[in-house]
Amino acid sequence: MSGCHINPAVTFALAATKRFPWGGVPAYWAAQVAGAIGGALAIWASFGSRVFDFGAGFGVVDFNNDVTSWGSAMFVEALATGILMFAILGIVDTRSPEGWAGLVIGLVVVAIIITVGPLTSASINPARALGPLLVSDLNGSFHNWTEQLFAYIPANLGGAAIAAFVYDWVAKPRIVQRPIKEAVTEPDRADAYESAAHV
């Protein structure tokens, strides 16, 4: 139906590499952020204000300035988001085995959370960072969210876009010649690259 982007960084990277129309980006971003805010509000409604006592358990992204600097947090988030984007493009490439996307992407996310979580809370998703932070601010539980947030959003967007360009350079999955609407919902095709090479 929609390509199941879920992540604004994924949408941005797909648009940057001509896999998705730029005109569709605002609507996707709005839906993704609204979903993140709605999810955070649902948790608040379900568990009450007690949920904010758990800090990161509510999903609020944060990094300890005594352990991780602002620049280090940006680098880690960019790298982690890039790894996720690279895995996504690799598994949806039609040269990859079919039916493994959910498992592979899920395992990559788990691995990223385990390794990056202690450093930056492993956002890897601007909407996932923004939703809980905004809701926590509404509750008055988190007051430096703007400082923290800007360590995540640029890193997530940039890391995903760089990874997408690197994937195209390394794997050469295709040269975009199909209608852009078709490229949104269908995976890359190796034969599209081959046929384009003979044009």
Language model feature labels by segment:
Residues 1-199:
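Membrane-interface helix-loop junctions and terminal tails of multi-pass membrane proteins
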